[in-house]
Amino acid sequence: MIPDRGPAGMDSTDGSSGEAAGGARVPDFFIVGNAKCGTTAIYEMLRRHPQVFMSVPKEPWFFARENPRPQNSTETSLEFTGSKHESFEDYVSLFAAARADQRVGEASSSYLWSRTAAQRIAAARPDARIVAIFREPASFLRSLHLQMLSTHTETEKSFRKAVELDGARREGRQLPRSADWPRALIYSDRVEYVEQIQRYRAVFPADQLLVLIYEDFRADNEGTMRQLMRFLEVDDRLPVEVVRANRTLGVRSVRLDAFRRSLRAGRHPGARALRELGKGLTTRKAREALYYPLMRRTVYRTPPPADAEFMLELRRRFKPEVVGLSEYLGRDLVRLWGYDSIE
C-alpha cells in the first residue's frame, strides 16, 4: 500500500487488488514502451478484445512525471513539464468505465525510459503485468527522430546533428522551446535497453514481465498478439484484427503541419467554424477518407532514405548495448539485428 501522498500525487491503493480509494481501479497491466515499436498497433488491437479495457488516451504518462509539479517550481528541469494528469484521482478515472470482468491497461511508452516509473508502478500495483518492446537501436532512433519532428518536439531536421546535440541538451542547452520533456530529446538515453529492463526486474518478479521484440511483431502480428493475450490471461482464441497504426512519416511542410495542428487543437480563430461546417456537410467516415490522403499529399511525405554511413556509426556505437541485452534476455539479438557482422 501507499501510505500517503507521494511525489507523483498518488493516494492510497490496495496493490494486491488493484483497487484505489473510492473503488477506482489501477491498471492490471502496463505496456511501457518503447515508442516506435508497435505500441499503438498493440493498443488498438487490445482495445478490440472484449475482455480488455484500455485507457483513453493511450498514454496518460502519470507514473513518468519525474517533475510532477513544475508550475510550482522555479527549477530548470530536463524532466516532463507538460500538463498530463495531475492527480491520482484524475488518473484512475480513466479506467472507471471498465467492467469488473475486464483486464485494465494503458500504454505509456515513456514508462520504459523514465527513471522512476517502474518504482511508482510497483508501489501502486505490485502485481501488475509489464510489457516491454525493444527494437534495433539505430532504426529505432531514426524513427523516433522523424516522429518527434512531426510532433514539433524536435526542431533539428538532421538526424546526425540531433544525435550529436545529446551532450549540449544534457546540460540544458540547445533545446527547442516546444519540448515539454527535454530529456526525451537525449537520444542516447533512449537506447539504454539493459538499464531500462533492469529497473523493472528490480521491482517485479520475472513472471510478471513480458519482453517482446519489435521485429518479431512485424513478422507475425497475430502470433505476437496471441502470446500477449496468454500473458494477460485473456482468451487468445478470438480472431485478431491486425491494425496498422502510427506509421512514421516525414514532414513535407512545417507551416502546413503547424496550421493543421492549430485547427485540430482549436487554437486557430476559425477552427470551430470549420469543424462545424465539415460536420454539417459530410459524415465522419467521409471526412476521414478525404482528410488522411490529403495530409499525406500536402503535409507529410515518405521519409528519405537513411544515411547509411551514420546508421553504421550508430550500430558500431550501440553494439555493446545489443550484446548486453542479448545476454540479459538469453536471446541472440546480435544476429537477429545484424550486429554479428559489425566490428
Regions found by a protein language model. Name each.
Residues 40-49, 117-126, 142-147, 192-236, ...:
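PAPS/PAP-binding and catalytic site of the sulfotransferase fold
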Residues 108-109, 176-189, 305-310:
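Surface-exposed cleft-lining segments at the edges of enzyme active sites
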Residues 81-85, 109-115, 188, 216-220:
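Acidic-and-aromatic substrate-binding clefts and catalytic sites of carbohydrate-active enzymes
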Residues 111-118, 124-126, 250-254:
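Short acidic (Asp/Glu) patches
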Residues 87, 91-94, 117, 193-197, ...:
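Alpha-helical packing segments of well-folded alpha/beta enzyme cores
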Residues 1-108, 123-133, 137-177:
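PAPS-dependent sulfotransferase catalytic core
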Residues 184, 191, 322, 328-342:
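Charged phosphate-binding loop/patch that engages nucleotide di/tri-phosphates or the phosphate backbone
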Residues 2, 58, 198-312, 316, ...:
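The conserved 3'-phosphoadenosine-5'-phosphosulfate
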